[in-house]
Swiss-Prot record:
Subcellular location: Cytoplasm
Source organism (scientific name): Corynebacterium jeikeium (strain K411)
Record flagged with keyword Amino-acid biosynthesis: no
Gene Ontology biological-process entries: chaperone cofactor-dependent protein refolding
PROSITE patterns xref list: CHAPERONINS_CPN10
Classification of source organism: Bacteria, Bacillati, Actinomycetota, Actinomycetes, Mycobacteriales
Description of how the protein assembles with itself and partners: Heptamer of 7 subunits arranged in a ring. Interacts with the chaperonin GroEL.
Role according to the record: Together with the chaperonin GroEL, plays an essential role in assisting protein folding. The GroEL-GroES system forms a nano-cage that allows encapsulation of the non-native substrate proteins and provides a physical environment optimized to promote and accelerate protein folding. GroES binds to the apical surface of the GroEL ring, thereby capping the opening of the GroEL channel.
Family matches, as InterPro entries: Chaperonin_GroES, Chaperonin_GroES_sf, Chaprnonin_Cpn10_CS, GroES-like_sf
Keyword Cytoplasm attributed: yes
Gene3D superfamilies documented for this protein: GroES chaperonin
Stated name of the protein: Co-chaperonin GroES
Top-level taxon in the UniProt lineage: Bacteria
């Protein structure tokens, strides 16, 4: 897992996208133009959660190391130390993949 000095705020989650397969099971190479935008990522860092109306933090549903599925067009792309990351809000995360 990447070691980054980025600390997400509130209910934001920093993820690194899991690259999609470049070949099919039968060995055919998938060209870049035919690939769909990936929606699976590994959680790198998690914010402390949003503040609720009663001044308590709303706990986060994900933790570092989780593999998640996120909304196709959610988040903000960023580069840090030559690596590409995506900064999502917790609402952009649709599911946790249990392994």
């Amino acid at each position: 897992m990447a070691n980054v000095n980025i600390k997400p705020l509130e209910d934001r989650v920093l993820v690194q996208i899991v690259e999609a397969e470049t070949t099919t099971a039968s060995g055919l190479v998938i060209p870049d133009s035919a690939k769909e935008k990936p929606q699976e990522a590994t959680v790198i860092a998690v914010g402390p959660g949003r503040w609720a109306d009663d001044d308590d933090r709303i706990p986060m549903d994900v933790k570092e190391g989780d593999t998640v599925v996120f909304s196709k067009y959610g988040g903000t792309e960023l580069k840090y130390n030559g690596e590409e990351y995506l900064l999502l809000t917790q609402r952009d995360i649709l599911a946790v993949i249990e392994k």
